């Protein structure tokens, strides 16, 4: 398999994975505030919980280009800062710190101990750190454990020792935790099983008798070696350990969590055991045992408690009772355990309790939750279960205990953090007639599943909307004096006059302002210390603080057509093409410059930059003319109104704005000229502050209307508001400082301006038709907007209605009681006078039952109703597995909804009692479904597709063509085309691309005359296909279960032969090669993404953009593959990728090239995520790489940002 390619793609992530595999808590910034560090895929993110707002704010995200297996925080004694240890797939232990001044992670230590990759004998799966920060243990699933001693040297720098081994061959490890031993030797506890005897015993008796052991490993700091200190057998179902506080805080030891019970164990204490309470209820199975899946221990002054979570999401509060001495003081001896129900939260991968009284729940599926503690559940009515009533012997059966679930009493949800995990399917379509399509996704599990609309844009908070007497053309706000904090007036310009409103408790019209109300206004500015100016077509009014007015009239037969102002300068353009320039003199009056500059064409727009700090004037005036040019004129006293530079444009400019903004290439600020054209194109070009030269122009198409530009302030930074057919905001990215241009999720505006008042410090005022709107933008760190619609069960697939803006989602939940079964159980309980409480499933989940399925089809309207508008429940224990909208030629091309189901399906090992294909007719414009009939098939039909006016179905390994009959589907043709099971179908013409569950894709041709399906080309690699789409007639893009994306192409000769007239007989009798088809597909590109692709689409994401491949991943990732157009770009980005991989290697020590080649060598793909790391480098490193590539830093940054902005966001 050659790794060179003549096709190249640029791989980019537009939405990072949202599944959190682990979260840790610590004071990573070295302050008293706690931060949360989360691992999502290969991304490491630090968040700041804000207790005042009740929000979790992401501060910084870094891609480590490796698999983060485990995280741990530790602090050296006497230090006030926590460090982070990463266990990854690099075969190295990594210690990093967060540097708040640079807002980045820095690597302190990288120690190699083994092979790379996630292997059973390479440490990295488990990580435990001594509570006093003296040592850490890193362990593998089998055999190997390494202990590193952590210390500091004479310069107070963190040091790490050589590893000490604590290996035990043929031993499996289930959990590792560090004991709290105070200042005695560090001790680590592990749950282990020795399988050496059961491995040798063919009878299976040794396996039945195998014991699970709790083992203590002690690190002797004096002798510098690790000893196996204590072992004790525990319950065989034990799977999790929790550290119990020791030293002055508690008795030390561990909690051992097993199926149905929790035991306290320690080498010098008695064991105590409590059962895990089970739910009461008419629909609950009283025999179902629970396990602990997550938990957290929290220490308070003089006390501690545990919150432990079961697989239902129920939280239990567990406390330890201590023996008291004669004086009533607590001794170090444990008296018993107590457990009681606390609250129910979503099933978590990590639980964190913050000192500020919050609980952070990193959910396994769906949104992550941030709760505030209302109380600690000490004095409530909940039944408490005590270990005194239960035997501590693991062999003795534990009497089940029950509790009644209820609504939340102790926790209050303050923020739900959007998460698309697990993202099961997506569609990219434009149903709202915006200029860009929306991404629709189905994600989540159970009753917490959602249908989401994802849209590129910034969230806008509207404050005021009020109707005006007529349609205004422009609006401004102004202060009265330079020292004012807030604006005093809103000035509205109409076709025949001007209206002034004062800003206070209420907004009212005022008349004694000195403004001319009988003429429209062109510009308003607070000038000098305390005066105002109003520019109107007939002249300039200079309104002094005492309301005296100085008037400068426009020359006869000429009027003012454009104006630009700042606090010391005014420039106006006359209808004759002349530029008149004024400057504020020493006594506060406007002085006109002697000469006027005649321009070659009519002036359409002007711009003066702000006066830089410490200067008396802005040095440049930008002039846009209708001859499609922009000129930069000097305003320096020696060269006033002299031409400095000129730039030709593709259309006449409609707006100009000179703004100083943050510059990612220099790290400081740079002067930029923003240009809006009548054609709807926006340009941003750098303006040299000395020479006035224009360079580094970047363009973006914004919409069909002429662009207007306004300088605004958002979250403390200067930004540009660009208005075309919809509003856009240009700002500096909070992390990279690169320039971002993002649409606002708001109505189209005709004019905008800054607005600042006591109620809204940083807002904007805008005009939309006859309405005045005041709004603000609060967050710039998230440019993907999400709208959610709740679903009933876990979604499996969905499709769009062929014409209407409706979607049909098939949903199915395993081991969940169906609505009919639930209703029957409730009726039975009611008849017996039992409990009939029904808990809300979105909080508590559905009642469970082994072997049961709950499944339905839901109709979603995301445009108008923004809700589920119809549903069909499936009965008889059927689960929906596939869906398609199929037009049947035999029914006059009427489109029917076809749903494939499986009956009595078992997921593992896969089995079922056959399947059905249901046919539904669309009614009421698709908002209702009428059941027609269903056809039994021998296996679940996992793939359905409309094909030439008939139905194509993948049933097991057989591909079939069905037509629609009166009573059932009629089989027309079939062929065994896949080795194992067909999971996906694509088609163009008579060609069908069949995805197999574990054997990649096979191309099949349908010969209409012979009525045969003939496979003619397949793949040479067994790919476990999860998603595929045809890119063109010969090429298919796909993703597999191991996180790879690939593109395969049919050889030209094989493709032509398959389509030849009458080639059916030849193809059927063509000799197969290596038990496959006669031909093999060619691999074009291959890359590892570290997420399972669940859908692929060839589409455009932005208005006027190229076709690209958009893919979604199971963990919530949304990525794109952009084809390169020129070989020159490929060479440049390949060189840049190599330089970045060597100059700034990945944080966790993984080799970047090997990481992207996890299962097969990377081929034909350039990693855009790595290229974008260039923005985050220091200036010196940027310049060094730029010198190596023989380019300027600005040029490299432009090329990187263009790759993204031309096709995506």
UniProtKB/Swiss-Prot annotation:
Presence of keyword Nucleus: yes
Molecular-function GO term, any one:
U2 snRNA binding
Q: Where in the cell is it found?
A: Nucleus
Predominant location: nucleus
Keywords associated with the record = mRNA processing, mRNA splicing, Nucleus, Spliceosome
Single GO BP term: mRNA splicing, via spliceosome
**GO cellular component terms given for this protein:** nucleus; spliceosomal complex; U2 snRNP
Q: Which InterPro entries match?
A: Beta-prop_RSE1/DDB1/CPSF1_1st, Cleavage/polyA-sp_fac_asu_C, Quino_amine_DH_bsu, RSE1/DDB1/CFT1/CPSF1, WD40/YVTN_repeat-like_dom_sf, WD40_repeat_dom_sf
**Superkingdom per UniProt:** Eukaryota
Quaternary structure and partners: Associated with the spliceosome.
> What job does the chain carry out?
Involved in pre-mRNA splicing and cell cycle control.
Q: Which family does it belong to?
A: Belongs to the RSE1 family.
Q: Identify this protein by name.
A: Pre-mRNA-splicing factor rse1
Write the lineage as a comma-separated list: Eukaryota, Fungi, Dikarya, Ascomycota, Pezizomycotina
């Amino acid at each position: 398999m050659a790794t060179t390619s003549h096709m190249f793609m640029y791989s980019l992530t537009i939405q990072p994975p949202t599944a959190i595999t682990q979260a840790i808590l610590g004071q990573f910034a070295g302050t008293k505030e706690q931060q949360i560090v989360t691992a999502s895929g290969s991304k490491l993110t630090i968040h700041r919980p804000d207790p005042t707002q009740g929000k979790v704010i992401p501060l910084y995200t870094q891609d480590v280009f490796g698999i983060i297996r485990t995280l741990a925080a530790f602090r050296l004694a006497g230090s006030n800062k926590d460090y982070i240890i990463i266990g990854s797939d690099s075969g190295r232990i990594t210690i990093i710190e967060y540097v708040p001044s640079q807002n980045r992670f820095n690597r302190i230590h990288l120690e190699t101990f083994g092979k790379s990759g996630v292997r059973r004998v390479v440490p990295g799966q488990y990580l435990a750190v001594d509570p006093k920060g003296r040592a850490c243990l890193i362990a593998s699933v089998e055999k190997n454990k390494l202990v590193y001693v952590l210390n500091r040297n004479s310069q107070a720098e963190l040091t790490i020792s050589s590893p000490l081994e604590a290996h035990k061959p043929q031993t499996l490890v289930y959990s590792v935790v560090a004991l709290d031993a105070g200042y005695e030797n560090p001790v680590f506890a592990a749950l282990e099983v020795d399988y050496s005897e059961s491995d040798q015993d063919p009878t299976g008796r040794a396996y039945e008798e195998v014991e699970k052991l709790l083992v203590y490993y002690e690190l002797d700091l004096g002798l510098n070696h690790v000893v196996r200190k204590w072992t004790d057998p525990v319950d065989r179902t034990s799977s999790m350990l929790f550290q119990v506080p020791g030293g002055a805080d508690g008795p030390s030891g561990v909690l051992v969590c097993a199926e149905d019970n929790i035991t306290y164990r320690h080498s010098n204490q008695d064991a105590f055991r409590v059962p895990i309470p089970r739910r009461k209820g008419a629909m609950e199975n009283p025999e179902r045992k629970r396990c602990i899946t997550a938990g957290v221990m929290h220490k308070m002054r003089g006390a501690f408690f545990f919150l432990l979570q079961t697989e239902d999401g129920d939280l239990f509060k567990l406390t330890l009772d201590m023996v008291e001495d004669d004086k009533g003081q607590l001794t170090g001896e444990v008296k018993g355990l107590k457990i009681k129900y606390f609250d129910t939260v979503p099933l978590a991968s990590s639980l964190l309790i913050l000192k500020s009284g919050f609980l952070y729940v990193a959910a396994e599926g769906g949104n992550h939750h941030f709760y505030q503690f209302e109380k600690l559940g000490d004095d409530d009515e909940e039944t408490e279960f005590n270990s005194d009533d239960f035997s501590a012997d693991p062999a003795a059966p534990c009497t089940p205990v029950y509790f009644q679930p209820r609504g939340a009493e102790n926790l209050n949800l303050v923020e739900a953090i959007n998460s698309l995990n697990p993202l099961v399917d997506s569609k990219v379509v434009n149903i709202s007639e915006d200029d860009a399509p929306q991404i629709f996704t189905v994600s989540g599990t159970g009753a917490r599943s959602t249908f989401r609309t994802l849209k590129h844009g910034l969230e806008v908070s509207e404050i005021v909307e009020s109707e005006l007497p007529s349609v205004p053309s422009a609006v401004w706000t102004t202060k009265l004096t330079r020292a004012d904090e807030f604006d005093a007036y809103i000035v509205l310009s109409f076709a025949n006059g001007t209206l002034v409103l004062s800003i206070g408790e209420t907004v009212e019209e005022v008349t004694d302002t000195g403004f001319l109300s009988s003429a429209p206004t062109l510009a308003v500015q607070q000038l000098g210390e305390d005066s105002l100016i109003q520019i109107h077509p007939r002249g300039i009014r200079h309104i002094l603080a005492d309301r005296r007015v100085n008037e400068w009239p426009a020359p006869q037969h000429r009027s003012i057509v454009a104006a630009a102002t700042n606090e010391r300068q005014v420039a106006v353009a006359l209808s004759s093409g002349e530029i008149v320039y004024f400057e504020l003199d020493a006594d506060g009056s406007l002085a006109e410059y002697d000469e006027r500059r005649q321009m070659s064409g009519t002036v359409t727009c002007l711009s003066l930059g702000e006066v830089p700090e410490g200067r008396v004037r802005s040095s440049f005036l930008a002039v846009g003319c209708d001859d499609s040019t922009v000129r930069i004129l000097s305003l320096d006293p020696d060269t006033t109104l002299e031409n400095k530079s000129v730039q030709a444009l593709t259309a006449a400019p409609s707006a100009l704005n000179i703004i100083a903004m943050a510059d990612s290439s220099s790290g400081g600020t740079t002067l930029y000229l923003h240009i809006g054209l009548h054609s709807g194109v926006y340009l941003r070009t750098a303006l040299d502050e000395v020479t006035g030269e224009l360079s580094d122009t970047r363009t973006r198409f914004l919409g069909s209307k002429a662009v207007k530009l306004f300088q605004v302030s958002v979250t403390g930074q200067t930004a540009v508001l660009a208005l075309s057919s919809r509003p856009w905001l240009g700002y500096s990215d909070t992390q990279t400082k690169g320039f971002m241009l993002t649409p606002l999720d708001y109505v189209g505006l005709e004019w905008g301006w800054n607005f600042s008042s006591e109620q809204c410090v940083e807002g904007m005022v805008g005009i939309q038709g006859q309405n005045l709107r005041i709004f603000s933008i609060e967050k710039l760190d998230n440019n993907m907007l999400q709208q959610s619609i709740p679903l009933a069960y876990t979604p499996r697939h969905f499709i769009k209605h062929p014409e209407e803006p409706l979607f049909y989602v098939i949903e199915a939940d395993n081991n969940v009681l169906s609505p009919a079964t639930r209703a029957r159980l409730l009726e039975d309980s009611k008849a017996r006078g039992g409990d009939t409480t029904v808990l809300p499933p979105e909080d508590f989940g559905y009642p469970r039952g082994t072997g049961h399925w709950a499944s339905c089809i839901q109709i979603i309207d995301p445009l108008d109703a923004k809700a589920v508008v119809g549903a069909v429940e499936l009965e008889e224990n059927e689960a929906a597995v596939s869906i398609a909208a199929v037009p049947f030629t035999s029914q006059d091309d009427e489109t029917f909804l076809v749903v494939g189901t499986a009956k009595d399906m078992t997921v593992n090992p896969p089995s079922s009692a056959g399947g059905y294909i249901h046919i539904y007719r669309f009614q009421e414009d698709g908002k209702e479904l009428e059941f027609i009939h269903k056809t039994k098939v021998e296996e679940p039909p996992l793939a359905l597709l409309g094909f030439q006016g008939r139905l194509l179905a993948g049933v097991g390994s057989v591909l079939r063509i069905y037509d629609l009959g009166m009573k059932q589907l009629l089989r027309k043709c079939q062929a065994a085309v896949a080795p194992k099971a067909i999971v996906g179908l694509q088609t163009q013409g008579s060609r069908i691309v069949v995805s197999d569950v574990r054997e990649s894709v096979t191309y099949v041709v349908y010969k209409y005359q012979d009525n045969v399906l003939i496979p003619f080309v397949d793949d040479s690699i067994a790919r476990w296909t999860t998603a595929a789409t045809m890119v063109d007639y010969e090429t298919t893009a796909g993703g597999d279960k191991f996180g790879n994306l690939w593109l395969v192409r049919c050889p030209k000769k094989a493709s032509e032969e398959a389509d030849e007239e009458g080639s059916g007989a030849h193809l059927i009798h063509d000799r197969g090669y290596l038990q496959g088809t006669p031909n093999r597909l060619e691999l074009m590109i291959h890359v590892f993404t570290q997420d399972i692709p669940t859908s692929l689409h060839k589409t455009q994401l932005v208005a006027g953009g190229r076709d690209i491949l958009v893919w979604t991943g199971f963990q919530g990732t949304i990525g794109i593959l952009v084809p390169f157009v020129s070989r020159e770009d490929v060479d440049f980005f390949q060189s840049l990728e190599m330089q970045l991989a060597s100059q700034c290697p990945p944080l966790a020590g993984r080799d970047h090239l090997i990481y992207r080649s996890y299962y097969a060598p990377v081929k034909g793909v350039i990693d855009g995520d790595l290229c974008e790391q260039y923005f985050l480098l220091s200036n010196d490193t940027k310049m060094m790489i730029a010198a190596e590539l023989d380019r300027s830093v600005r040029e490299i940054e432009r090329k990187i940002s263009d790759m993204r902005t031309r096709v995506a966001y």
